[in-house]
Amino acid sequence: MNNDPVGSTWKKWDLHVHTPMSIVHNYRRGSPDEVWEAFLRDLEALPPEFKVIGINDYIFIDGYRRVRQAKFEQNRLKNIELILPVIELRLDKFGGVVKKDQDGRDSPSDWNRINLHVIFDALDPEVIQQQFIGALAP
């Protein structure tokens, strides 16, 4: 048992970070290298209390690969202690969620479209690609 006199420490996490490789992102100006440099600089400029980020690029893992490369091969993102891959799945139908319309009939509810976020341990991206993304059925 660890008898650390400090006890618990609280850190801020942002588990919904979209990279320039995401379908939706805010980095559109410049060459691909310039766009990535701006993105990485923004991550490095996060307030010091942010220690964990989740790279969330829908059903793609390429942005996570690139951020890991910056952290571990280029020695960047020293302010970030942990980078987690997050896969976001958008379901256009969510079974069993209905509401009654004005005539008393079942109709789709406002909850008929939801997003699922699957947060993985900081795994090798190839494991996630092969064992999770590769197993998704169309």
Range-by-range predicted roles:
Residues L91-P138:
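Internal, well-ordered alpha/beta segment that forms a basic, Gly-enriched binding/recognition surface
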Residues M1-W111:
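An N-terminally biased module of ancient metal coordination in phosphate/nucleic-acid-related enzymes
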